[in-house]
């Protein structure tokens, strides 16, 4: 998956992706990332 930095593509806004902590006492690792671009017309 590539980040949406290309012009002319149909891209979605950023979404928050949360990754469970490796330890039981850790916090959720949440980061904002770009959704993937869809190919084709729409």
UniProtKB/Swiss-Prot annotation:
Read off the PROSITE patterns from this record.
MYOTOXINS_1, MYOTOXINS_2
Name which cysteines form disulfide bonds: 4-36, 11-30, 18-37
Concerning Pfam families, the annotation shows: Myotoxins
A GO BP term here is: envenomation resulting in occlusion of the pore of voltage-gated potassium channel in another organism
What are the GO MF terms of this UniProt record? potassium channel regulator activity; toxin activity
Family the UniProt entry places it in: Belongs to the crotamine-myotoxin family.
Protein name stated in the entry: Crotamine Ile-19
């Amino acid at each position: 998956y590539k980040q949406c930095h290309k012009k002319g593509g149909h891209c979605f806004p950023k979404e928050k992706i949360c990754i469970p902590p490796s330890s039981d006492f850790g916090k959720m690792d949440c980061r904002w990332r770009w959704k993937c671009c869809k190919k084709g017309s729409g």
